[in-house]
Amino acid sequence: EGNDNYISHFGIGHEAWNFNKNELIDGKVYGYLKADVSSLFSEKHNIFFFSRDSNGDLFFVGYYKDCKYLTEEERIKLKEKMVESGLLDKRINQVYRILKNEDDFSEWSWDDVESEFGFEVSSFKLEVLPENITIFENKIPFTEQDCIEVLEKGWQERYGNYTLIPDLDRFLSKFLMK
């Protein structure tokens, strides 16, 4: 479905839709974030996504520039739009088809998968313009100490596989120059 279709390139994973620029609502991508963090509501944020390999080594996957963390009211409206557009059912069906072939989840029904997406409030909490999404072609290795030096704060995985980037230019120059 085009060069920007993250899912066609990488499959469905924990937050596979975070980088899919083909499935827009009102011209924006809505990314998944596990944490509920009300302190993020009032301003735009730069957020990087990372993963760990089987050895526990860290790798940057990509980032959002100037994304907005949606309030609960905004997420309720988003959920309605996702239902109306058919996008929510499409995503639930993608996950359901994959899980039914996995031994640990083969007993799950479509309704079980649907319940994981939340009922009234969308679990997609980040709003970003497609042009403000970057996914790295090759994952970029880093260490916790690298982040502490650049972010000038202690390392934490408070938000799951994400952290906030106060100074995006400084951050990128440090890690893209490695």
Where are each of the predicted segments found?
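Intrinsic-disorder/low-complexity loop/linker signature
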Residues: 22, 27, 56, 137-139
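Compositionally biased, charged N-terminal/linker segments
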Residues: 1-41, 174
